[in-house]
């Protein structure tokens, strides 16, 4: 019975957190400020974890809810979407972090080894990889945005 309670709890968390993530004001999320700003050491960690090799292999919410912007299918005007994409990485990171914290409640629903195993699986495979992917992709998107902004400034200077 504990397993079923945990699964129902995690399912409800997933659905509710998705909708809350969509409703949160995007003005709360800034990729260049704490806690979303990536530290310099994170790039080494991501290389060690080989995030670039497995990030495309994990399930992607944008395939389930196509209104999200899938990074793999950028249209020709993707540069205009970069600020929103950066915000989305912050929202997704926040959501998965909260889900990790709330995931520990399952230990009350199913105390003991079984609950601990299910909670560990939920956190280690259901949320942590997605949080890592957001932190891995955000600096790359920020570099693209910065390059785009530099190009725009140069073009404006040339036109004047």
Give the location of each predicted region.
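Hydrophobic alpha-helical transmembrane segments
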Residues: 1-9, 108-121
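Residue-level signal for alpha-helical transmembrane segments in multi-pass membrane proteins
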Residues: 20, 102-109, 129-132
